[in-house]
Amino acid sequence: MNTHPSHPDHPADTLPARGNREGTTARTYEVRTFGCQMNVHDSERLSGLLEEAGYTAAGEGDTPDLIVFNTCAVRENADQRLYGTLGNLRAVKENHPGMQIAVGGCLAQKDKDTVVKKAPWVDVVFGTHNIASLPTLLNRAEHNQKAEVEIVDSLEQFPSVLPAKRESAYAGWVSVSVGCNNTCTFCIVPSLRGKEQDRRPGDILAEVQALVDQGVSEVTLLGQNVNAYGVNFVDPELERDRSAFSKLLRACGDIEGLERVRFTSPHPAEFTSDVIDAMAETPNICPQLHMPLQSGSDRVLKEMRRSYRSAKFLAILDEVRAKIPHASITTDIIVGFPGETEEDFQATLDVVEKARFTSAYTFQYSPRPGTPAADYENQVPKKVVQERYERLMALQERICEEENQKFIGQTVELLVQAGGGRKNDATKRMSGRARDGRLVHFTPVGTIDGEIRPGDVVTVEVTEAKPFFLIADAGVLTHRRTRAGDNSAVGQVPTTAPIGVGLGLPRIGAPVPAPATPDNACGC
């Protein structure tokens, strides 16, 4: 579907952001993100596009001239959250002349014209495949004085060929692919984001290098199924390569200044030993693996079209722990999939007990229109789902605490975060992530080289363990100031210029050089 397609010769398409038309201040914007890490990264691209078009980020507490929602469609409450928020904004918009509201992302791709039917005060609706159209659509909506809805069925531009304004001075997302070739019966994502298309390795590494050149020390490689990377390169000159992801991980190990590399999410059916070997043998690959289980019942896995069974899943974990003994393993689990029996659920509990996950993202199944599972007749009653969910949560919480107790007395290295703890102001603590991804709240006293900033690196001794975090109150053992910390202190975040090839386009030249190092950077 392509509703109201763009026309390059449309007089509204070339208008700048409204605030600049008569010498007034630039219009302000805010991007609100619902959903997964892929959406967070897409929102960085949206921010980059808007700033390139002349918008500026709204100040905290200010009412922006433009609000962009980047939405999720995975669970039912995502719909409710969006439309509830849009309802609250109706009066705000009426009291703020010229304000615009745009809705994009997976829910917009799914609902299309339904968005403006439910919320007629929305100005622009765009999908997952045409985020580059947003500035044009905003100008056209103002020019035509009506909502502009543009949803396209295939990717117009690979997101990496768009500019990005990053959210963090010290950690960055880098997409390795878009789309997914799996057909899980509960998941709507493939129908919204399309078939998998993989970036060239050189383009990915160029983007990683651009981030590192600006002080970023941790990068997370993103894809709907990262370990399938290499099955369908967007560059037709590159041949299919089943070992491409392990090669990419090893190449990241050669980037000087890149201290931590993570990736998400893999798929158990395609997770291979060469990736585990690359993790074990590449020092900057973090000892952390997110491996979605979804269910411990082989019967349910078959109904989900998850092309692995519990024995294979546990065998992967065994191999990871044999080669990376200190690895932290996290997972996703769905409770109450249609037809799930008590026996099926018990199988999930059994796998969770054996797997000893560091943490688990547990979800109560919610039917998504357009997915096969939504039409299954044997939906599990809500009350039963809730009871099972609570049992699973109790089991996983016990395991989390037992595993975290093992860290008491150990020394861990932390990349200091901005925020991270709801009680940090009251407890006078700061927060950071260990190399294995565990969240640690620490007291910033001891061996400190000036103020500790987000992006700096500290080592601490763990003194207490809770189910979902560790505490280190014995003081800081070492503190290393970093360029990322320098940038955090002055509110500077990286920007990345367009990198790589567009879809079906020939190769382009070298990426635009990264911005120069700020004068106050320590260079370490």
Swiss-Prot record:
Q: Which cofactor does it need?
A: [4Fe-4S] cluster
Q: Where is the TRAM domain?
A: 405-476
SMART domains listed in its UniProt record: Elp3
- Principal subcellular localization: cytoplasm
Cellular component aspect of the GO annotation: cytosol
Reactions mediated catalytically: N(6)-dimethylallyladenosine(37) in tRNA + (sulfur carrier)-SH + AH2 + 2 S-adenosyl-L-methionine = 2-methylsulfanyl-N(6)-dimethylallyladenosine(37) in tRNA + (sulfur carrier)-H + 5'-deoxyadenosine + L-methionine + A + S-adenosyl-L-homocysteine + 2 H(+)
User: SUPFAM superfamilies attached here?
Assistant: Radical SAM enzymes
Describe how the cofactor binds: Binds 2 [4Fe-4S] clusters. One cluster is coordinated with 3 cysteines and an exchangeable S-adenosyl-L-methionine.
* Record-level Gene Ontology MF annotations: 4 iron, 4 sulfur cluster binding; metal ion binding; N6-isopentenyladenosine methylthiotransferase activity
List the subcellular locations: Cytoplasm
Locate the compositionally biased regions of type Basic and acidic residues.
1-12
All copies of the MTTase N-terminal domain together span: 27-143
For this UniProt record, give its keywords in alphabetical order, as a comma-separated list.
4Fe-4S, Cytoplasm, Iron, Iron-sulfur, Metal-binding, S-adenosyl-L-methionine, Transferase, tRNA processing
Q: Where is this region: Disordered?
A: 1-23
Q: Which family does it belong to?
A: Belongs to the methylthiotransferase family. MiaB subfamily.
Function, as annotated, reads: Catalyzes the methylthiolation of N6-(dimethylallyl)adenosine (i(6)A), leading to the formation of 2-methylthio-N6-(dimethylallyl)adenosine (ms(2)i(6)A) at position 37 in tRNAs that read codons beginning with uridine.
* Subunit and interaction comment: Monomer.
Q: What is this protein called?
A: tRNA-2-methylthio-N(6)-dimethylallyladenosine synthase
